[in-house]
């Protein structure tokens, strides 16, 4: 029965396949893909779109088989640019023991210490951290070096931007620690920044460190049980002495798209509804900018002088 099919709104479908909301709307109106309406919202049934690679992957997912790996032993890790701990939490849930987390921002460090008092949080500038005591003691190093220098939503200064040079601090940490594997994430704009020369520099640096880079991949959060339209470039590198002995496989996507309702109310993500909260008030300047974004829009809808 058609009512048992998975419904996805036009906007979420656009995020899933990496196109604009306007394009998804045109597909629905032109009949490029069969559209339907549920509760006043127009969208599509995933089962009718299985020819699309992203949809096929979701409908034939091995998510449940891959979600509960059993570690062969206790694995150690180091987290750089830890922020509030999102990536670190994921690594912890995957079975890694954090030996060290480094973060510059005091508020973020306070958050880490409050939520995970057992973690060894080193607050301060990564440029002042000596990683040599951890040499050959760490299995995995990870970090999302600051992305403003490469972001589509930023001025794209790249390595000319002070923040862009922090990649080389991550590279120094890898050189001093010599982890078996390291991972870094950034915005997908990094791939095309400066006509690809920035990313070529990163790839060459990884090779000089003695690591083999797995073919980088842009992962969409919306495909991995996260109710968020966020895309991130994931880079994983394996130390050369191990690279021929292991095979890395990107994870299968979740079987359906999660929405804001899943984030706010009891669902497959959370056991309870989100508690009642006053929320956070934006500064007046930021609130004014956000008011210029139409429903379903993003930074690309802002006037050029603001975006």
Please annotate each region the language model reported.
Residues 34-36, 213-214:
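Short secondary-structure junctions
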Residues 123-124, 188, 211-223:
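Conserved S-adenosyl-L-methionine
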Residues 180-184:
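Conserved beta-strand signature within the Rossmann-like core of class I S-adenosyl-L-methionine
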Residues 145, 186, 217, 252:
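A cross-domain feature marking catalytic cores of carbohydrate-active enzymes
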Residues 55-178, 188-192, 197-200, 207:
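Core alpha/beta nucleotide-donor-binding catalytic domains of modification enzymes
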Residues 131, 224-228:
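Acidic pyrophosphate-coordinating catalytic loop
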Residues 137, 227-232:
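A short, glycine/Asx- and small/polar-enriched loop/turn
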Residues 1-30, 37-100, 205-208, 232-307:
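S-adenosyl-L-methionine-dependent DNA methyltransferase catalytic core
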